[in-house]
C-alpha cells in the first residue's frame, strides 16, 4: 500500500511514528514549510518533518497544496491512501479524490462534537467529562465526513489543554493502527454524521481569548485557565502589566465586592471576586518574569485586598 501522510504540529507526530513502528511504509510526508523562529529568525522544521526525517521518509513542503504543480507531483506518487492529521491547509477535491481508499482524517474530538481547529482546548473550556479521537473519511465539508472509528478518552478534573493534547495524540496513533487493516480489507463501516453539530464550531484559538472576564462565573474562568495552558494562557492586567494565570481554583462563596477585586492575597492564593463565586489564583506569571506560585509572587509584589484586576493596561 502506498501511504502518504499529511500533518504539521506535535499532535501529528505520534500517528506518523506509529505507522513506522508497525511496519507501514510511508511513501512521503507532506507538511507545512519551515518557518523562522526566535530572535535570530532561524528557519525551523515542523515537528512532523523532524519525525519523518528520523525514519528516512521523503518530505514535501508545498506552500499551497492546491497548487496544480504540487497536485500533479502528488498524483505521480499514486497514493492508495492519504492520512491527514492537523495539516493546516484545506485539501482540495482534486487531492481528496486521488487515492483509491480516499483521504482519512484523525480528528481530536468525538465527532460530530467540536468540529474545527481547536477541539482539544474547547473540550476543557466547556467542562466536558470526556473527549476522544475520530477517524473519518474526508469530504469537502469541514470535519463533516463519514466516521470510521472512534476512541473515548476521559478528562481528569485537573485536565489542561496540554495534557489532553498529549493523551489524544497517543490515542489517535493507537486508533489509526487499529483502523487501517479494516479500511484496506474492505470491512470498515462508515457512519454518516448529522448535519448539525451539538456544539459550536471550535474555531482557532487566539491570544485575546485568554483575557479573564471576572464578571463571569469563577467555574468558567477556572476551566479557561486550564484549557489555555500551555498556549496562549489565561491573563489579566494589574497596574498596567500583564499577569498570566496558570493555576486556579474556585471558592464556593459569593463575594460582595465588584468583579475583579482582590478579596485576599496570602499563601493560600489570591482570591478574586467574580460574577458568581470566587476565583483563587495559585500560579501566576507577571510580565517579564518567570511563572511562580502565588506565595512566591506575593513576596516580591505588593497586592492587597481592594486592588483591582483590569481588562486592559490602562
Indicate residue ranges for each PLM-predicted region.
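N-terminal glycine-/serine-/threonine-rich beta1-alpha1-beta2 phosphate-ribose binding loop
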Residues: 36-78
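Donor/substrate-binding cores of folate-linked one-carbon enzymes
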Residues: 22, 32, 81-201, 206
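Conserved beta-strand segments of alpha/beta enzyme cores
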Residues: 25, 56-58, 102
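Acyl-group handling in specialized metabolite and lipid biosynthesis
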Residues: 203-216
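An anion-binding loop in the catalytic cleft
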Residues: 214-314
Amino acid at each position: 500500500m502506498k501511504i502518504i501522510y499529511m500533518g504539521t504540529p506535535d499532535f501529528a507526530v505520534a500517528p506518523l511514528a506509529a505507522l513506522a513502528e508497525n511496519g507501514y511504509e510511508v511513501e512521503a510526508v507532506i507538511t507545512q514549510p519551515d518557518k523562522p523562529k526566535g530572535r535570530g529568525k532561524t528557519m525551523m522544521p515542523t515537528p512532523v518533518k523532524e519525525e519523518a526525517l528520523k525514519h528516512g521518509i521523503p518530505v514535501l513542503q508545498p506552500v499551497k497544496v492546491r497548487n496544480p504543480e504540487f497536485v500533479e507531483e502528488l498524483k505521480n506518487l499514486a497514493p492508495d491512501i492519504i492520512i491527514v492529521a492537523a495539516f493546516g491547509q484545506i485539501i482540495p477535491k482534486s487531492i481528496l479524490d486521488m487515492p483509491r481508499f480516499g483521504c482519512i482524517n484523525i480528528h481530536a474530538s468525538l465527532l460530530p462534537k467540536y468540529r474545527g481547529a481547536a477541539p482539544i482546548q474547547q473540550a476543557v473550556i466547556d467542562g466536558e467529562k470526556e473527549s476522544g479521537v475520530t477517524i473519518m473519511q474526508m469530504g469537502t465539508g469541514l470535519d463533516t465526513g463519514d466516521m470510521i472509528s472512534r476512541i473515548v478518552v476521559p478528562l481528569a478534573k485537573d485536565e489542561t489543554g496540554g495534557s489532553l493534547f498529549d493523551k489524544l495524540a497517543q490515542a489517535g496513533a493507537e486508533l489509526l493502527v487499529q483502523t487501517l487493516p479494516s479500511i484496506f480489507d474492505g470491512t470498515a463501516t462508515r457512519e454518516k454524521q448529522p448535519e448539525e453539530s451539538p456544539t459550536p464550531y471550535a474555531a482557532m484559538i487566539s491570544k485575546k481569548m485568554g483575557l479573564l472576564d471576572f464578571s463571569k462565573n469563577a467555574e468558567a474562568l477556572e476551566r479557561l485557565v486550564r484549557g489555555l495552558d500551555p498556549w496562549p494562557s489565561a491573563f489579566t492586567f494589574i497596574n498596567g502589566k500583564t499577569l498570566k494565570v496558570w493555576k486556579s481554583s474556585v471558592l464556593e462563596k459569593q463575594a460582595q465586592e465588584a468583579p475583579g477585586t482582590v478579596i485576599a492575597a496570602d499563601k493560600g492564593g489570591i482570591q478574586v471576586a467574580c460574577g458568581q463565586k470566587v476565583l483563587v489564583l495559585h500560579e501566576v506569571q507577571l510580565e517579564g518574569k518567570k511563572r511562580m506560585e502565588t506565595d512566591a509572587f506575593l513576596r516580591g509584589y505588593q497586592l492587597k485586598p481592594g486592588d483591582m484586576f483590569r481588562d486592559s493596561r490602562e
